[in-house]
């Protein structure tokens, strides 16, 4: 039979104005309902055809895939050598779907916005449709992701199905003052898997901010600190779908790298927020000064400051642990924290079992009146918390402190001085 090389197809009963173009089959019209389930039974390809398929404008009152429904939608095609590009517009999403004309590429979705209503009763069944039916790799990006009409910024990722799991690889996003990108190993991934035990989400990525104070305010935390930059590498998991995340169920580890920290002086911390209470524990200008009588406020007039903060926090079901010390560096001084904090079932942090090792040049911290616990400076000897120092006070010395009690009522105990081996 003779092959079609040009012409037009009008969908629906409404009259349309259209003309024949050489080498083009044009499509125009209106369809009341399109069921995408039928696409599994169709074998459509433009390979080796001697015409271009052009959708001038197709309108659908409803597009259906199982329980998922798109409202009134307008579609037109855009010319491309590698892809059949469909421009799609409705009240839920607007953007392009690029379908490869050959096997050298995979489909791409590029959206101006997408509005996902997680509060709807069928939101989980909609996800299940994607989880159960997606069998090809997709590249997806959107300038604006709206969840229940709240804008969570721009995101991009490769959507890869694999057995009983689906992976969001090369995950990147910007949400206000927060950013999400690949780790130092070049990985950024959210994996969602299903087993007999239920759903599990695993996140490996790096979160960062160049304006941490504004970033924390953005998520409802009024910070008791100032900070220049913040990075955290997350290797965490939780036993639910991503949007059902519950803080007490998060397990894994978080590596922190912050610059320019200043913990502000506050007479009383009213908030019950775990993060802010934990940050307050690290403010050595208060509790540690009372134990040693060293004058921390001589250097930290506005609150405790650190040039950098690095370390790792391990999250277990019943505790959080500093196996790799959380190291605060401030000039020639270092403050290393290790130990663990009880993690209660509610998510609240309980009993403290921490050790802090302080390494510093003592002269910088001597009070102006030169009277310390144990006595004054005499004959080249200085007594600090009962230990005599005869050597040059400009050299580094180290002391150890134990921190017990709770975040609300911490108890600090001086354990003693020891020789520091650093040059």
Model segments located where?
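Solvent-exposed beta-strand/coil patches in large extracellular/periplasmic or lumenal scaffold regions
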Residues: 1-9, 41-96, 121-207, 224-353, ...
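Flexible beta-edge/linker motif
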Residues: 20-23, 27-28, 58, 98-113, ...
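Short, structured interface segments
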Residues: 26-46, 108-126
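Gram-negative outer-membrane beta-barrel proteins
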Residues: 35-39, 115-119, 146, 179, ...
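Extracytoplasmic loops and strand-loop junctions of Gram-negative outer membrane beta-barrel proteins
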Residues: 215-219, 292-295, 383-384
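Short proline/glycine-enriched turn/loop segments at secondary-structure junctions
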Residues: 244, 388-394
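Short aromatic-acidic-glycine turn motif
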Residues: 346, 361-369
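Short hydrophobic membrane-inserting alpha-helices and related fusion/pore-forming segments
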Residues: 371-383
């Amino acid at each position: 039979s003779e092959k079609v090389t040009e012409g037009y197809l009008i969908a629906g009963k409404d009259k349309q104005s259209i003309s024949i173009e050489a080498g083009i089959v044009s499509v125009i019209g209106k369809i009341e309902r399109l069921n995408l389930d039928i696409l599994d039974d169709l074998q459509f390809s433009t390979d080796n055809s001697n015409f271009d398929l052009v959708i001038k404008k197709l309108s659908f009152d409803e597009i259906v895939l199982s329980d998922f429904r798109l409202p009134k939608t307008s579609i037109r095609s855009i010319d491309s050598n590698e892809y059949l590009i469909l421009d799609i517009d409705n009240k839920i999403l607007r953007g392009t779907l690029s379908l490869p004309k050959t096997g050298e590429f995979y489909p791409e979705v590029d959206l101006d916005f997408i509005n996902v209503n997680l509060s709807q009763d069928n939101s989980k069944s909609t996800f299940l449709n994607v989880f159960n039916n997606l069998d090809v790799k997709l590249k997806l990006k959107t300038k604006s992701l709206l969840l229940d009409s709240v804008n969570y910024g721009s995101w991009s990722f490769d959507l890869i199905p694999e057995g009983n799991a689906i992976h969001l690889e090369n995950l990147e996003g910007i949400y206000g003052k927060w950013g999400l990108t690949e780790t130092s190993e070049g990985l950024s991934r959210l994996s969602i898997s299903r087993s007999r035990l239920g759903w599990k989400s695993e996140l490996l990525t790096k979160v960062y901010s160049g304006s941490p104070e504004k970033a924390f305010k953005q998520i409802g935390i009024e910070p008791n600190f100032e900070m220049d930059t913040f990075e955290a590498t997350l290797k965490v998991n939780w036993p639910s779908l991503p949007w059902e995340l519950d803080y007490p169920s998060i397990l894994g580890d978080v590596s922190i790298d912050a610059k320019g920290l200043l913990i502000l002086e506050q007479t009383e911390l009213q908030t019950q927020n775990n993060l802010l209470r934990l940050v307050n524990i690290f403010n050595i200008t208060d509790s540690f000064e009372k134990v040693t009588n060293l004058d921390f406020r001589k250097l930290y007039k506005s609150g405790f400051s650190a040039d950098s903060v690095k370390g790792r926090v391990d999250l277990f079901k019943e505790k959080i642990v500093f196996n790799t010390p959380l190291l605060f560096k401030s000039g020639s001084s270092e403050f290393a924290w290790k130990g663990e904090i009880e993690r209660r079932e509610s998510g609240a942090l309980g009993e403290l079992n921490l050790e802090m090792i302080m390494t510093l040049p003592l002269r910088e911290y001597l009070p102006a009146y030169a009277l310390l616990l144990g006595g004054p400076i005499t004959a080249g000897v200085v007594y600090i918390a009962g230990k005599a120092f005869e050597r040059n006070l400009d050299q580094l010395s180290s002391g150890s402190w134990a921190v017990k009690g709770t975040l609300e009522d911490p108890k600090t105990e001086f354990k003693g001085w020891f020789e520091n081996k650093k040059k």
